Amino acid sequence: MFKKLFLFLFISSLAASVSAQLKSKAQSFFSPRYTFQIPGGDMSDRFGLNSSLGLTFATKKENGTYFGVNGNYQFGSDVQEAGLIQNLLSVNNEIISVEGKPASVLIQQRGFNFSVDFGKFMRFTNSKNESGILFTIGTGFIQHNIRFEHQLDDIPQLDGEYEKGYDRLSNGLMLSQNIGWLFFSKKRFGDFYLGLELIEGITSSRREYNFDTLTSDLGDTRLDLLFGIKAGWVVPFYKKNLYD
């Protein structure tokens, strides 16, 4: 579903902008960004809706050629992994601390990814600003795991090496496709990016054994999908060159 939607948006925007392309001006910039992400594939069996914060360093040439590098930190609080820590729960579905009392455990999603992107910037003919549609594809690395936080309680079952038996650490190659609107204003601090992103992570579990389910999925291939809505502030390095 995500791939069909992304392909439709990509083709529609391409058809609308090819005839409206102007020569662009070269520009390098960095961009802090936020992405709201909807999981798909194997990722949706483990996590729900989540977010990422990232930073992009990029350059676009006069012919519209785009090159960028990205790093993103992923986080979320909707963990849906089946059987997670089931062996640690009491008959009342509580985890008991070393003090013999019910403990408070915050279960969260954590992860990161980084990639190298290539693409094309197409400027609009009717735009008085240096703005247009940006298409990119990229490749890189993605990793995610489950994090257990229990600062107020002592739970040795979820500390150190024991935690590795529950955290479902997975990582591997990622591919990405992006389509968005890159806008450079004549006004200072008025530049931004809005877009859609599809990430395909071809990952594998890196833990030998899951203590809670008494199973091993070490080396099993996963297809982790993330469909994202991305927004970012764009900071050019030499903005005065855009409108000389």
Task: Give names to the regions the model predicted.
Residues 4-14:
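Sec-dependent N-terminal signal peptides
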